[in-house]
């Protein structure tokens, strides 16, 4: 009986450790994507599903970790907020801190789309005032290091891969994005 309780205790400790690591740990993963149309290295930092997480006072650990990667642009791809927490200041301070080193672009996720404490247009305005460009069903052509690249924001939670399964506006957006 004592061995079983010890094993259960160790498993509980490991689960708590893993949960803390996933909530408060910062991990950078590098990916190299080659494109025949781009001849210069462009570094993009991509953040997603932060859900109002805080990494150090005023998110300084996260801001430093991103800045240390020396990105040319930062893309936040949804769920910067937690839809049921009435505190947008965590996100605004993060955007403000990140935007000091390079441009920040945001594509909205379901937590922004369904945020309970603010109208969507007001939320977008706050993100933009903090220093981000919000791409909500739109795209933008950018010049970075002499290269023209197109980025866009499309909210399509569980977006289907087959055109016939997508909404007409999503198909139109993706078609225009490719051109």
Spans of model-derived segments:
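A short linear-motif detector with a strong N-terminal bias
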Residues: 6-13, 23-25, 84, 112, ...
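N-terminal membrane-anchoring alpha-helices
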Residues: 1-38
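Mobile, glycine- and charge-enriched loop segments
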Residues: 23-56, 173-179
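A generic short-segment signal for beta-strand/edge and adjacent turn/coil regions
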Residues: 1-3, 11-17, 43-45, 74-76, ...
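Short beta-strand-to-loop junctions in surface cap/lid or active-site-entrance loops
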Residues: 34-38, 65-67, 152
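Conserved catalytic scaffold of divalent metal-dependent phosphoesterases
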Residues: 37, 52, 112-179
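Membrane-embedded segments
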Residues: 40-136, 140
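Short, flexible loop segments at the rims of nucleotide/cofactor-binding pockets, characterized by
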Residues: 21-23, 50-55, 81-85, 157-165
């Amino acid at each position: 009986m004592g061995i079983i309780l010890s094993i259960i205790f160790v498993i509980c400790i490991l689960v708590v450790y893993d949960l803390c690591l996933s909530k408060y740990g910062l991990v950078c993963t590098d990916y190299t994507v080659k494109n025949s149309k781009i001849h210069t290295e462009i570094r993009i930092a991509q953040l997603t599903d932060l859900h109002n997480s805080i990494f150090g006072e005023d998110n300084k650990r996260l801001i430093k970790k991103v800045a240390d990667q020396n990105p040319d642009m930062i893309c936040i791809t949804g769920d910067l907020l937690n839809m049921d927490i009435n505190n947008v200041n965590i996100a605004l301070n993060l955007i403000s801190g990140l935007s000091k080193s390079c441009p920040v672009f945001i594509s909205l996720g379901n937590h922004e789309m369904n945020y309970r404490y603010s109208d969507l247009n007001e939320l977008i305005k706050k993100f933009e005032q903090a220093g981000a460009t919000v791409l909500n069903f739109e795209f933008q052509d950018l010049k970075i290091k002499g290269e023209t690249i197109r980025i866009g924001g499309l909210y399509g939670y569980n977006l289907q891969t087959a055109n016939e399964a997508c909404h007409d506006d999503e198909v139109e957006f993706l078609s225009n994005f490719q051109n």
